[in-house]
């Protein structure tokens, strides 16, 4: 993603220091300030996936869950996405947040620790307090319901669904 400097400046973009996963912020925060978008079929950057220490490796992501949660919380606070006038932009931004909430929730559950389950709960409570309409939209959606199935059985069902999705789409 390439943005003109003026777009980044207008958006007030400030990335947290010494934090992984800020590429999500870089793509998300300036987007409402973009007036025109162009697709160029050019590889500006090649990302080799497969190293064990890579930041997108599932085990590494679980180890850095606090950074994932921080980035997600920051993104939740940038805009009241339910009030974005452009319907397509609003839809995209809501979906992006839904994906971020899902990733954070799945990682917390996959970690298997009570501490991270509590952090997941706190993230959803943060969203509820920050933006109730968005919370209701995400929480009652398919992914939100799946991420919050009750009990150990619900968490096992979510992980089974995650593994099936993982095989189908080939991520991590």
Per-segment meaning from a language model:
Residues 86-90, 135-137:
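Short, surface-exposed acidic
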Residues 110-172:
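Membrane-interface aromatic/basic loop that binds lipid-linked glycans or pyrophosphate carriers
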Residues 42-51, 57-84, 103, 107-133:
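Catalytic core of nucleotide-sugar-dependent glycosyltransferases
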Residues 4-61:
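Conserved nucleotide-sugar donor-binding catalytic segment
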Residues 92-107:
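Amphipathic alpha-helical repeat scaffolds of TPR domains
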